[in-house]
Design a protein with these regions (language model features):
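Flexible "arm" and connector segments at domain edges
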Residues: 1-103
Length: 103
């Protein structure tokens, strides 16, 4: 887990650098920081909610002995949503780091 955490921190720092290059290194206010953080958090939650739905769907499909291609499609959705959720959380962490520069 330590190696993965280090890789994620690296990605957060890269995302932070990218955001600073595009939008400046500081927020104009803590209100702006909150708004951006809240948006990223909501996007992460949306991905998590869909992921949860797909996992529940997978379990229902398994219990009903669904066709393997249907199960495969659901697993592909789970994979995609997990990746997208991780991306949103990386962006959330990067924006939290940027907000720390305002304090």
């Amino acid at each position: 887990m330590t190696i993965l955490k280090n890789r994620i921190e690296y990605d957060v720092n890269k995302e932070y650098d990218l955001a600073c290059g595009l939008h400046g290194s500081k927020f104009n206010s803590l209100h702006e920081a909150y708004a951006v953080l809240k948006e990223e958090q909501e996007e992460a939650k949306l991905e998590s909610d869909v992921l949860n739905y797909e996992c529940e769907k997978l379990w229902s499909l398994i219990k009903s002995d669904a066709e393997s291609d249907i199960i495969e499609g659901t697993l592909e959705n789970i994979y995609r949503k997990a990746i997208l959720g991780a991306c949103e959380l990386v962006q959330t962490a990067a924006m939290a780091k940027k907000a720390l520069k305002k304090i």
